[in-house]
Each structure stands twice: as structure tokens, then as C-alpha cells.
Amino acid sequence: MAAERELDSSELPGSEALLDAVLRTLYDLGETEGETEQKRTRKKKEKKRDSETVADRAAEPLPLPASPGRDQRKSASSFFKKLREELQSAPAAPSEVPAATTAVSLFPLENDSKLVEVVEFHSRSEKRKPKSEEDKPAKNKTKVLEKDVVIQEFNLEKARLEVHRFGITGYGKGKERVLERERAIMLGAKPPKNTYVNYKVLQEQIKEKRTSMEEEKRAAQETDIFKRKKRKGRSQEDRRSKKLAPSILSSGRAAQVGKFRNGTLILSPADIKKINSSRVSK
């Protein structure tokens, strides 16, 4: 058993070196057309280093087994099978390989296809808009929203109450209170309780109201009659004064002065004397 352990320990470092060499050769196969000379020189140097390490490890003296049996061979074959299965299922690439693959993927792009340059054209004729004009639409939107809110808040009932309040101010103090009471009732206040009066007292109140109304009517009629009489006296005096006043061009035949011939008024010397005398009398 001790001999088998020694064989396994001796075979492990050599097998690991061989596997590393195989993996590196697999990744190095198949050179692309766009590889540069620097990359090729790097690969050659790495190959030389790997070969030197493998040769050094192979040159080291290994402890030879006394009598290799079937058990040792089976253990070695099973070990290599496990390694192969692990490599096939999940091949773990070394840290150096991704850098090489990225370099390979970048070099063909530089050689075969160039990046497209993007050019922006700014014409001199177009005037750049100031920031104030850009801010105006936002301000206009806010104003429109404020107007909409004000329109929505407008209420017909409030407007009606304000108009009613303004109309009450035109009346006297006595009537203002009555109208204010009616407005309060309209808004939902409780109306005052009805006052109950005896039937006989109510009839007396109605009679007093009627008598007061009749007296007011009589006084108004008397004042109207007195005014009418004054107007009639003035109108009669005016008529009399108009009749007594002499008129030169009156419609009567006796008062007519001169004669008309072919549309012209012809005055005699007697007519001229009458006209002059009437002016002196005035």
C-alpha cells in the first residue's frame, strides 16, 4: 500500500504538467488571419517556456515502483478518465487565455472594418432659440391650469347671494333688515314663529289700515286737484296774452300788411307808417 501511494504521488506532478501542455496547445491551435507579429512572438515564447518546464519535470528522477500490479494501473486509468470527464463537462480556461481571445477579436475589427465617424451639421442661418422662449410654454401651461381651477371654483349660488346682498343696499334700513331675514331663511335658517292675535283685535287692525289708506288717497286727490287748477289758470292767462298781442303777419284779412304779387310783398307808404308806429309803441 505504501508503494502504491508513492507511485500516485510521483505520477501526479508529471500528469498535471502534461495536461497543462495539452490545454495550452489546444488553445493555441488555429491561428487567425488578422494576428499580428507581436502576438506570434508572444506565443512562441510561451511555448518555449512550457516545453522547458515539461523537460525539467521529466528529467527529475522518479521513484520506480518495485512491482507494478493491476491495482496501480486501474487507479491511474480511473484518475485520467475522471480528469477527461471534468474537462469535457466544464473546461476551466486559464487566466491568460481570455486576454488572448479578446486580443484576437479586437485586431480583425481594426484591420477589416473601420468605425463610422458621426458628423453633426450646424447651419449658421438657423438662429438658436433663447431659453426664455423655451420656458414660456411651461408658464403658459401653468396659467391655463390656474384659469381652469378658477372656472371650476365658480359657483352660481355664491354669485346669486352676492347679487342679492348688493341689491339690499339700495333700500332703507327698515327694509334691509326684512330682506336680510328673508335671505337667511333662503339659506336654511328657521323662520320666526307666527304671532297669534285675537279675532276681534285683528278686525280692528284691518279697519284702521283701511281708514289710513282712504285718508292718504283723499289727501293725494286734493293735492292733484289743487295742482290742476293752478295749471288751468296759467294756461288761460297765456292764451289771453297771445290773443291781445298784435301780429304783423297774421292770418286775418284786416291785419294783413301790403299785397303779394308774383311772390313778392309790396308795401304802401301807409303800411310802412303802421309798422313804424307798432315798433315805437313796444
UniProtKB/Swiss-Prot annotation:
Q: Which InterPro entries match?
A: FSAF1-like, SSU_Processome_Comp
Task: Indicate where the modification N6-acetyllysine is found in the sequence.
Answer: 173
Region ranges (Disordered): 27-98, 121-143, 208-254
UniProt KW Metal-binding keyword:
no
Q: Where is the composition biased (Basic and acidic residues)?
A: 48-59, 131-143, 208-226
Q: What is the predominant subcellular site recorded for this chain?
A: nucleus
A GO biological-process term: ribosomal small subunit biogenesis
Residue stretches of biased makeup (Low complexity): 89-98
Residues modified as Phosphoserine: 67, 75, 268
- Check the record and name the Pfam families matching this protein: FSAF1
> Where in or outside the cell is it found?
Chromosome; Nucleus, Nucleolus
Keywords of the record, alphabetical order, are:
Acetylation, Chromosome, Nucleus, Phosphoprotein
What does the entry list under GO cellular component? chromosome; nucleolus; small-subunit processome
Q: Which domain of life is it from?
A: Eukaryota
Q: Whom does it interact with, and what assembly results?
A: Part of the small subunit (SSU) processome, composed of more than 70 proteins and the RNA chaperone small nucleolar RNA (snoRNA) U3.
The protein's job, in short, is: Part of the small subunit (SSU) processome, first precursor of the small eukaryotic ribosomal subunit. During the assembly of the SSU processome in the nucleolus, many ribosome biogenesis factors, an RNA chaperone and ribosomal proteins associate with the nascent pre-rRNA and work in concert to generate RNA folding, modifications, rearrangements and cleavage as well as targeted degradation of pre-ribosomal RNA by the RNA exosome. Prevents helicase DHX37 to be recruited before post-A1 state.
The protein's name is 40S small subunit processome assembly factor 1
Gene assigned in the entry: Fsaf1
